[in-house]
Amino acid sequence: MTTAPTPSIFEPARLGPLTLRNRIVKAATFEGVMPRGAVSDDLINFHAEVARGGAAMTTVAYCAVSPGGRVHRDTLVMDERALPGLRRLTDAVHAEGALAAAQIGHAGLVANTLSNKTKTLAPSTRLSPPAMGLVKGATLAELDGVVSDFERTARVAVDAGFDAIEVHLGHNYLLSSFMSPNLNKRHDRYGGSVAKRAEYPRRVIEAVRVAAGSSVAVTAKFNMSDGVPKGLWLDQSLPIAQILEADGHLDAMQLTGGSSLLNGMYFFRGEVPLAEFVASQPKLVGYGLKFYGPKIFPTYPFEEGFFLPFARQFRQALRMPLILLGGINRVDTIEHALDEGFEFVAMARALLRDPQLVNKFQAESVDQGLCIHCNKCMPTIYTGTRCVVRDALVVREAPRLGQ
């Protein structure tokens, strides 16, 4: 019996109907440059720069399927009004030889009810910190409406020229919360057993697949673990992933974990930029963060490729293409992932630190990125997501450039 050779990082690879120029994609990271949800030149330039830097595909982060599905008021709602700007974005990415993906979702319990001025949707009645009060479980009619929103949004993404659509099934946003035994206490067709808790995400994915057609890839960002007590863990997430695979509507699954609602550091790892978070918030919120921040943001030591131990179990159980995510900063990590059977890797912070990193990997001028996992990029989502270390170097170099 012969073993198939490990694919090269820089050979073209298939993702559903698409051919990607290499095995590295830019993971969705909220860009923070969409004032009142508008497509801006900064957003377009952000993704064009990533594409120019060599990534095979760049993902526009968190496009809400409705105003109520926004994380806050500066979240893009992907509807017909956004089409002209989104077409400019996909054209800019394509001009650099890369493909463009749109991450679409509904924030659910993570939504900011006050700025959205809409009702928060959740699987079940519970207290919600972002809503600052009790949130009632969504009705069947409301959930039907969200399915229609996903379907419409997928059509807009296709019209805008996106090559792939990533459905957000992670971090305890709406679809992820339906999978979670901690958040889903329903007693109807969408709650109870593992199979029933998978039913609503299945319905949404099918609607997106039908709307997207056969020439656009459909993927899911999927929670392997919520990282919280009584939440979703591998004993239940693996069977759900197998159900989604059997449905046949997904071209790939990007594996993640954690909860934006209850445990945000789980999918970052490394240093907690608490002082920077406090400074980025209004005074009252900042005071609260100062005292309760250590509980809200527990510390997890950073390890290169930190989701690999969990993801390895998914690789063994599934046949569909898988995208490895989580602290990938080195060439040898990527090679190891491909050797273990992952079709692609997704990078985020490393490309914030150096958008040219993929080109440098290919030229063999470096074998690892410069990200130090200080996570000080996290609080910049309110003013334009960026690497503050990179910013400081640019400022420091400016006088030399003027000499």
Curated annotation (Swiss-Prot):
Temperature dependence as stated in the record: Optimum temperature is 45 degrees Celsius.
Activity-pH behavior: Optimum pH is 8.0.
Record flagged with keyword DNA repair: no
Class of the enzyme per the UniProt entry, highest EC level: oxidoreductase
Reactions catalysed according to its record: 2 4-sulfanylbutanoate + NAD(+) = 4,4'-disulfanyldibutanoate + NADH + H(+)
UniProt binding sites for FMN: 103, 348-349
Active-site residues annotated for this sequence: 173 (proton donor)
Signal peptide from the UniProt entry: none
Homology family: Belongs to the NADH:flavin oxidoreductase/NADH oxidase family.
Function, in words: Involved in the degradation of the organic disulfide 4,4'-dithiodibutyric acid (DTDB). Catalyzes the initial cleavage of DTDB into 2 molecules of 4-mercaptobutyric acid (4MB). Low activities are observed with other disulfide compounds, such as 3,3'-dithiodipropionic acid DTDP, 3,3'-thiodipropionic acid TDP and DTNB.
Protein's name in the database: 4,4'-dithiodibutanoate disulfide reductase
Species whose genome carries this gene: Rhodococcus erythropolis (Arthrobacter picolinophilus)
Lineage, top ranks: Bacteria, Bacillati, Actinomycetota, Actinomycetes, Mycobacteriales
Gene name as annotated: nox
